[in-house]
Amino acid sequence: MVSESCSRNYNHPYTPYDIQIQLMDAIYNTIENGYKIGLFESPTGTGKTLSIICSSMTWLRTFKRNNTFLETNNEVEDVYESESEEDEPEWVKKAYQSSIVNRSKNKLIEYEHYLDKIEKEHAQNKRKEEELEIKVHKRRKAMTAAGTDLSEESYLPMDYYSDSEVGKIEDQNLAITKEINRLLKKVENKEEVSYINECPIKIFFSSRTHSQLNQFSSQLRLTNFQASFEDLEERTKYIPLGSRKQLCINEKVRSKGNDQSVNDACLDLQRETNGCQYLPKNYMMSSVTKEFADLSLAKIRDIEDLNELGIELNICPYYSVRKGIEMTEIISLPYQMIFQDTTRKILNLDIKDSIIIIDEAHNIIDVITSMYSIKITSDQLNKVIKSLKIYLNKFLKRLNSGNRINLMKLIKICQILLKFLNTNSEKVKSGDEVQIQDIFKDSTGDLVNIHKLDQFLTKSKIAYKIESYIEKTEMETDNGEKKGRITNSGGSSSSSSSSNPLLFTIIKFLRTLTNLSKEGKFFWDNENGTISLNYMLLDPSAVFKEIVDQAKCVLLCGGTMEPMSDYMDYLFPSVPTNKINTFACGHVIPKENLQVFPISQWNDTNFEFSYQKRNDSKQLMALGEFLIEITKRVPYGVVIFFPSYKYLDQVLQFWRDTKILTSIESEKTIFREPKDPSNVEKVLNEYGYLIQTERKGAILFSVVGGKMSEGINFSDDLARAVIMVGLPYPNAYSGEMVTKRKYIETSELSNGGTTTDAKEKSRNYYENLCMRAVNQSIGRSIRHINDYSIIYLVDRRFSTPRIQNKLSQWVKERISITTTNNNNNNSIYIMESTTDFFNIIR
């Protein structure tokens, strides 16, 4: 429903719906009323991103406007205290205060005019170049192994001097350089526009994917907010932050496949005599850097725009964008940048008193856990040891003693880990805990200082050098043909993979050995017969606490946040409940546009797709018959979700053998979600073309947790029905799940809980993982106010209050309850309701 009125002016570019106003009010009030945490669920398709932008930016501009007087009043008091003139008349103080406000306002006006001017000049220059057909390509041509004969010297690491004076001198020089830069920056800041220094409170918007962050930029372009002063036009100061891989414009560096290699290649290039052609010495003092920063603030630009701007100005976007951070009001950035303290320090991101917004937060616990977790296998270790030996044999005589000794130590540690894996692989089971001392038992590994070895790996950047050399040798064969290098994905590729090379994985694992914490555990896992040694962060609240403590307010937003209890239990257990505000809004669609049917049985067959019962042939036949009837009644697209690829394959094979699939195919063309993510787009395009262009029916068999359930939107005819088969519980016997549940139970007992309490909390955690996946999958179908669909939840457990209470609010309130105890009547009722639904709504 479109709202007639709004509680306050949020400067929404459109007339907001009631639920959008409710969400904006909830966000604004959470910040304004001093809550530390806000949890917000707003279904996908309800304009969530715009609501977040409008409420948070309206609060920020209101805060800046209301606090100008307070800040200038404090400044006046400081001036009079320092000058010992407290007896000045009040009217003199007010006049002085007014002059400061006016000067601040005038400086802001001056800066706004300056940004207008440089953006206009930039646009004019760009047009002239286009008219003259001058193509500005400042990038270097990619230097590939095939096209350029790189000197073997380029594969040597920097000389490493362990505990030597040379190392100390280098560290001292680095410290001196940093201090000089700090002082220069201080002087420069004095010379720049005063009274409009950095924004007092910043908004950090973080999301999972590059496309989601780009969508945020595009939504921000639609908005225009009240100024910090009256009678002033003030643009939104926004900067998107990205990785080197996204922002680097040096093709020599960009050509490296993965993030870590790009990072190391960039730093390696800077150490060379001539450095990088796009990064001037003392770049923060460069006028071109300042021009880049000012232009980046002059209008809303996304990552691609910054990349293009860097090419036009011949300056590095990755480093230059930092120049504008102080003036920025709102910054978008990927999860890794906000959650890793070291990354925030490198980027000089001060989150103190800031507003931090985490979008798509339904998976945030898993994201933080995976960022600080790692596993290794014997196959990986064998490949790394082989690569290290090849490299050492090649460059042995050219390596200095520090590099040579530490490389041998690295090989030794890898061999110890390999022996430990091979020795125990036959007698361990998933979830068995591993003690560090057991790894080095009966070996000399404990004599190796792993912390110093880590310092060597970090400072020498040798992992990147070895990876580059091995990649070169593997890309060359005697007949000149190319073959792919082996990466952490386990496969090979003819081009650089996005997966991290194995050596980086092993190094990350070694670092967990040097930074042991009570929040993590080492354990065994057995996945499809492959034994791995794992480290897992068990308490993500330790990472999240630092952010919560520093920030003014942390807002977690998502389309499917239910069940919300996990966030309170595992992300911020130390935050008092009166400092946490929760809100779940309904959907923009009319109530009659969505029906939800829990399907407990079909005719006289009960549905329960538990691990023990899911292969029952009678049940699979009944599911097939149910699906045939659905495909007859639902127009155009039907999307059906199964718990796993393996189970989907089993069901499809059963239906082929029993001719069920033939009957389904007579009603709708069948599509199946591919296991290879690179083929997903092709399948989706074919599925969409058949429905939207040829106006035919199709059914898409998908998997919970796959690409279809996470990032794909099935709007309009693409999903007139969504079917969820069973409850997609994760594997209860995986090493990760066994270790996590054991940790939850132990923690509950140590906090004074009973054994029953501990088991219930562990069960809740396991169940909530399942239900968040359900909510995420079924939320794919409704994308806008005029959309309509039916959701079928096929399993008797979906009819229980315990499970229904964990569905998203907008789904739960639309559940259709069948009152008859007759199975056949229930089946008839559901089919008749389906037919009536589409007859009426169409």
From Swiss-Prot:
Cofactor: how bound: Binds 1 [4Fe-4S] cluster.
UniProt xrefs under InterPro entries: ATP-dep_Helicase_C, DinG/Rad3-like, DNA/RNA_helicase_DEAH_CS, Helic_SF1/SF2_ATP-bd_DinG/Rad3, Helicase-like_DEXD_c2, Helicase/UvrB_N, P-loop_NTPase, RAD3-like_helicase_DEAD
Main location: nucleus
UniProt cross-references to PROSITE patterns, sorted A to Z: DEAH_ATP_HELICASE, HELICASE_ATP_BIND_2
One annotated GO molecular function: ATP hydrolysis activity
Motif (DEAH box): 359-362
Annotated positions binding [4Fe-4S] cluster: C248, C266, C276, C316
Record's GO cellular component terms: chromatin; nucleus
Gene3D superfamilies referenced in this protein's UniProt entry, alphabetically: P-loop containing nucleotide triphosphate hydrolases
Positions of the Helicase ATP-binding domain: 6-417
Cofactor(s) required, per the database record: [4Fe-4S] cluster
Homology family: Belongs to the DEAD box helicase family. DEAH subfamily. DDX11/CHL1 sub-subfamily.
Function: ATP-dependent DNA helicase important for chromosome transmission and normal cell cycle progression in G(2)/M. May have a role in changing DNA topology to allow the loading of proteins involved in maintaining sister chromatid cohesion in the vicinity of the centromeres. Has a specific role in chromosome segregation during meiosis II.
Protein name stated in the entry: ATP-dependent DNA helicase CHL1
Organism: Candida albicans (strain SC5314 / ATCC MYA-2876)
